[in-house]
Structures are given as structure tokens and as C-alpha cells.
Design a protein with these regions (language model features):
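Mid-protein regulatory/catalytic core that forms ligand/cofactor-binding pockets
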Residues: 1-75
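Short, charged, intrinsically disordered terminal tails
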Residues: 76-86
Length: 86
């Protein structure tokens, strides 16, 4: 499978959790220092393996071991690109 936005990947999960590798962060995410800091704290950075879940208008994403779970609105999640694992 190829690279897709976090929003598209999460939508395909039908509410179940899914595993993906973060490939890149789009420019709209890169220019927001506060958002970048949140992503860094959660370990949601390129090459990180994350667990993703879709939830009404937002995407929940977490990296094991960080203890941080991010709820990203779709308008932000669509600028985080992932490749499905497994």
C-alpha cells in the first residue's frame, strides 16, 4: 500500500485501531510551532510507528511508550502522511 493522509487511512479503519508508519509532515503542519511541539511530544514524527483511530471529525494518534495521545482534527490530520503497516 502507498502513502496516504492520516485522515484517509483512519477513515478506512471503520473505527478499529490501525498501525501505520509516519512518512512525512505536510508544510501546513511544519509552520505551526505549537502543533509541531505537540507532535514531537507524542512521538508522531517521520519513521515513527503509530496507532491510529478515527473518531467523528478527528483522528486519534499515539506512539507506544510516549504516554501521549493526540486528537487531531481532520483539517490537521490530512497534512500528516502515513504508510499502513502489516
Amino acid at each position: 500500500a502507498g502513502v496516504e493522509s492520516l485522515t484517509a487511512f483512519a477513515r478506512g479503519l471503520d473505527g478499529a485501531p490501525g498501525a501505520a508508519r509516519v512518512v512525512r509532515l505536510g508544510e501546513p503542519v511544519q509552520v505551526e510551532p505549537d502543533l509541531l511541539a505537540q507532535l514531537r511530544d507524542a512521538g508522531v514524527l517521520p519513521d515513527a510507528e503509530v496507532t491510529v483511530r478515527s473518531d467523528a471529525g478527528q483522528v486519534t494518534v499515539a506512539r507506544e511508550g510516549t504516554g501521549v495521545v493526540l486528537d487531531l482534527p481532520d483539517e490537521i490530520a490530512r497534512h500528516v502522511f502515513v504508510a499502513p503497516l502489516g
